Amino acid sequence: MQLSTYVRALWLALAGLFAAPTRGAVIPEDRADLLYHYYDGGGTTVSGPALLVRKGIGERVSAYASYFIDNVSCASIDVLTTASPFKEKREEYGGGVDYLYGNTTIGLAVLRSKESDYVANTFGATVTHEVLDGLTTFSLGYNVGRDNVGKVHTDFADHVNRYQYKLGVSQVVTKSLLMNLNYEAILEDGYLHSPYRAARLLGLSVPEAYPRTRDSYAMALGIVKGLGSNDGQLNASAHLRYRYFWDTWNIRAHTVDLRYVTRLGDRWLVEPRYRHYKQSAASFYADDFSTQMVFMARDRELSDFSSNALGAKASYQLFNNRFSFNRVTLNFDYESIRYDYTNFTDVRTGRLYAYKANVFQVFLSGWF
């Protein structure tokens, strides 16, 4: 069974833990990360380990490889109203290399994930370049993906082509102020919905019908402000990020992300955070259609809804310069999310649907 959009987003967030460096003129440090993640919300649980190792090759090249497992148990409202609860396993293999040339870093990456009814293959390339003594960094990114879509116990087969373009600029404004602006475009064509879901027409279940193309865009502005202590040293930072999303399905979305990072003593680094998200519904979405339409969807992720997330991350430095490691940290991350739907009802109760989700991660990181 195909995983929900949130689970895929969680996956991307975990992968971002091991992303290329933020500064183009320095290759990443050698490191290894072992992670366990757990998600529970809306009748779906996802858990599993992740492993990544990154190693420098000379002074200009850094290579990495990653492996993730998701064990999924799903009894979400979509499943309970249109199908049967299921269990699923998803695996992902990835790898990449970053090459440093002067003030420019070029990165290449490949990714393959596999479920019983969905196989995704992605190739990506990035370029970052620093100017003005590192005060300004420009970044470009391109990803191309080919997904194969199936349906268990049937011979159904289709595909999705995906092309992603990214542009970004980061500017050091003062010694304690950093700003960045990012643009993203994703062009998709193919089978863009789930073969398991159904729409409702006058209370009856009918097959969903989606457009076979979707273009989506996003702009994001981020601000990081360093905060000092009595001795004048920066030991904390405040982060603010706003993202606006729009697409050709008439969805409009706003995201506001606030976080605060500070040190507690010599070993602890803590990061409380809050995120608000709100989106409008797709033009062909309805909770219950009154007449037959060319395109018809009842995916709650295309409806009008909002979410509020409150979380915190804590990192504890275990030791330095022992067991062949320069530094080892133990990290914990927890987030509680509340989803509220404006025009999606639970057909079992007739009430507007809402649910809470909990996300927990624990990982061990070592630099060598």
PLM segments and residue spans:
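Residues that define the transmembrane beta-barrel architecture of outer-membrane proteins
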Residues: 45-49, 89-93, 100, 119-123, ...
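Outer-membrane beta-barrel translocator/channel fold
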Residues: 44, 66-96, 135-200, 215, ...
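Short loop/turn motifs that connect adjacent beta-strands in outer-membrane beta-barrel proteins
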Residues: 22-29, 60, 103, 132-136, ...
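Transmembrane beta-strands of outer-membrane beta-barrel pores
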Residues: 36-40, 69-73, 101-103, 112-116, ...
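Extracellular loop and loop/strand-boundary signature of outer-membrane beta-barrel proteins
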Residues: 36-39, 79-84, 109-113, 126, ...
